[in-house]
Amino acid sequence: MEKSTQERFRRVIRVSAAISRHFESNREHHREDNNWLEMLFKELLVALKIHGIVIFKPDPNSVAPRKGNAKSLLRNVSPSVVLLVVSSSYGIHYAASSFTSLGRNPNGLLSLFSDVAYLFRIATALFTAFYMTSVSTSVSSLLSDSTTIFQKTLPPNAIKSIRGYVIGMFVFAFANLLAFLGVKLTELYQSGFDGYYNYNLYDLAPESKSVIYYAVPALDIAFCTIIITMPKWIMGFHVSVCKYLGCQAVSLSGTFASERVVVLKRAREFREYHSALCELIFRFDEIFNLVLFFWYADIIISFVLSVPYIIIRTDNSTPWTYAFVIIDVACNVALLVVFNMAASDPGRLARDAQLVVLKMSSRADPDDVRLNHELLLLANAVKVAKVEMSGWNCFDVQRGLTITVLSMLSTYVVIVYQMMHHTL
């Protein structure tokens, strides 16, 4: 009896040790996947982390617990919470200062277009920060699952293409930040510190020109620039992930289309991989389809309201102000085009998969009943995925839609210019 009890305890200990080793290996594998993804998107992830949005959170088991004093509580405050508080506070401040400056600013009515555009961009930044705070875990899980499912099967040229997109979007977002910073600095240079206090800081300039006198406008410009350009980093990350999913689709189709001999196992693997990738794209669409509408609205409204401001202020602004505003508008239009191009990239899966099925069917043995049945299931799965993908908000993008939007915007510019030319 005593021996059987000891044997039972030993068995329980062995099973517990095996379970712990299993979970530890899974945790290590998951951490390796995250490290690989962090290296793939490292520039944009660092920029998002600076802004308070953390996609890949650290493992809670690897973080040592801290004592419950006031200093540790401040350390444990999420940076995203700080971002939300700062964004909302600055949005209220900017709305109030814009409203109160209408009576004091001689160009108040002329700058009303840009003020409304900036208010909407601040509101978009606040909503984006709140939304990304709530879905950052889902985005991290989606990217980790994609690496686990496809086991890092991306070819080197696909990885190089994704890295090019990541670096390009990083440079683009940073250029947009510099352009907007240039707009605010030239505004400060043109109005002077006293004028900046009068128009943007409720005419609360300190009497003595101390460090605070120069620091407050600098902080105001820094906060405004960081908050308004913050969504551009997230848009760049969204475009890069679209490219990543598109490369997964191209790699998957190319791998199976190049096989000369079709067997039952490979046909079933293609159907499973195709379904898994469609599920990942569907999850990505569910995560970003809501905020995508606000991003498009932000881009178009900024363009629509900035064009009259540029035309009205041509004779009153310095060449640098004019140039920086044009760069900011051009970045928004370029982002609209890049957005549509990247969003249509995962849609290759629906087109290329049909070609792969046709190639596999032409090479299959007509007498192999099980293989042909599997190919029939694969063809049906591809057709169903194509129908579902046509209703996904993030990826139902056509070239004609982009051309139509750009034509409408260019027509709008011409009409506004003619109207302003005859009015002024």
Enumerate the predicted regions with their spans.
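Amphipathic, non-membrane alpha-helical segments in soluble helical-bundle scaffolds
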Residues: 110-113, 136, 212-215, 235-242, ...
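Helix-loop-helix junctions within predominantly alpha-helical proteins
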Residues: 81-118, 149-236, 250-265, 307-334, ...
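Cytoplasmic membrane-interface regions of multi-pass membrane proteins
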Residues: 61-63, 138-156
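Generic structural signal for well-ordered, non-membrane alpha-helices
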Residues: 121, 144-151, 247-254, 272-275, ...
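Membrane-cytosol interface segments
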Residues: 22, 34-46, 114-124, 128-144
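Inner-leaflet juxtamembrane helices
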Residues: 126-147, 235-249, 332-360
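Terminal membrane-anchoring module of integral membrane proteins
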Residues: 2-81, 167-175, 264-424
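Short intracellular "coupling" helices and adjacent cytoplasmic loop segments at the cytosolic face
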Residues: 130-134, 154-159, 254-267, 359-372
